[in-house]
Amino acid sequence: MRAVRCSLIRGVAGLRMASSALDEMKEQMLRRWKEDQKKIDDLRKKHGHEKLCDATIDAVYGGMRGITGLVYEPSLLDPAEGIRFRGLTILECQEMLPKAPGGKEPLPEAMFWLLMTGEVPTEEQVRGLNAELHRRADPEAIAAAQKAIAALPRNAHPMTAFSVGVLALQSYSKFAAAYAAGKSNKKTYWEYALEDSLDMLARTPTVAAMIYNRETKGQVELAAPSNSDLDWAANFAKMMGYQDEEFWECMRLYLSVHADHEGGNVSAHTTTLVASALSDPYLAFSAGLNGLAGPLHGLANQEVLNYLLSMQERVKADGVNMHDEAALEKALSNYTWELLNSGQVVPGYGHAVLRKVDPRYTCQRNFCLRHKFDDDLFKLVNTIYSIMPGILKEHGKTKNPYPNVDAHSGVLLQHYGLTEQNYYTVLFGLSRQMGVLAGVVWDRLQGRPLERPKSITTEMLAKKYLCNSL
């Protein structure tokens, strides 16, 4: 009887904490919105006709690379510092965001709070948000996603299953229901978008864990039940079947640092674009996942891992001692020059914007060093890191000879036995929802309109520029 009473007391306390945290999140958002709105009004009134960039013909044909055409609030990619989440660098986030007891990595819930509000949350606010997410993990909605995924062909890709699972959750969209009933308007869209975003964040870890067990065991089910005493990342890892608390800490890091990467990448822009039509967050994020599933966006870490595994096989085939640092450096240097001289690129090195080592790479490397990784793959990636920038500088055909986040993430997962490469993009998507959903909520809060850029044809460009030059 006492145990039941204590459980009820904890349950009531958890509800109060969750409700308080949500109220505080909304208050912080509205306070920032008022500050931002004055800036937006002044910018549009005083500088509305100022040019941000010139769109060249090369840029139009080149994937719009370099064209500044979006406002996206959660994050900004700094060429010198890497990604900044609401102005904070990766290192600052690691230092300032609340952590699990005894842990050193930021909790993803804390990262979500930062992206959504622009403020670093307190430990109490993070506990409240965690309680709120556990409260919103509706078994009925999750069962609908489970049923939809189970109906897929056995060979369906995990990203197909994730996108379908999110679409199945859409049946429970509060944004869509309120809009259909005429209960929402431009001033309240953001609140319904926030409701859907919190619900999605609460339910997708269970869906993603089911997809993992479908991939490894053939059954759309959990390896362990959800545990409301655990944080978001630890609970997800345990539902996948991982009991190692060091891996839970790894997941906290992985899910936090992949949370956003400004608004122009395929998954973020797709989510933003679809949501601009007042499609609810589920529809928008499912579309973003489909973009993330493309090999040019979400498969980079798999390509790096395949490259590393091929290097590992070649080292062994050539009889190189992995523990002889000088011999390993010499062999890898020779392999790299062969690759470059054949016209290929080194996977995991270089970045479209960054001009230094990706801080997301650095924090993953530091995690491995702190936890004393000693496996061959880590030795390999660490040795490549020591020689590659010098080789690429000498080669002279790359603007950024330093590693990006993808150069390390696969090694991290392989170390803990998560070897199912097809699943890696699901982890990426689970993390990335935090940033893109924060972007969607802020678009609705700021009253952002439907996206409708102008397109042009080759024939029209030819008539304008080529005919006059003949």
Curated annotation (Swiss-Prot):
| Residue ranges the record marks as coiled coil | none
Q: Where are the active-site residues found? A: 297, 351, 406
Taxonomic classification: Eukaryota, Discoba, Euglenozoa, Kinetoplastea, Metakinetoplastina
Organism, scientific name: Leishmania major
Q: Which reaction does it catalyse?
A: oxaloacetate + acetyl-CoA + H2O = citrate + CoA + H(+)
Additional remarks? Citrate synthase is found in nearly all cells capable of oxidative metabolism.
Instruction: State one Pfam family annotation.
Output: Citrate_synt
Q: What is its EC number?
A: 2.3.3.16
Please state the protein's primary subcellular location.
Answer: mitochondrion
Q: Which GO molecular function annotations are given, in alphabetical order?
A: citrate (Si)-synthase activity
Sorted alphabetically, which keywords does the UniProt record give? Mitochondrion, Transferase, Transit peptide, Tricarboxylic acid cycle
- This chain belongs to the protein called Probable citrate synthase, mitochondrial
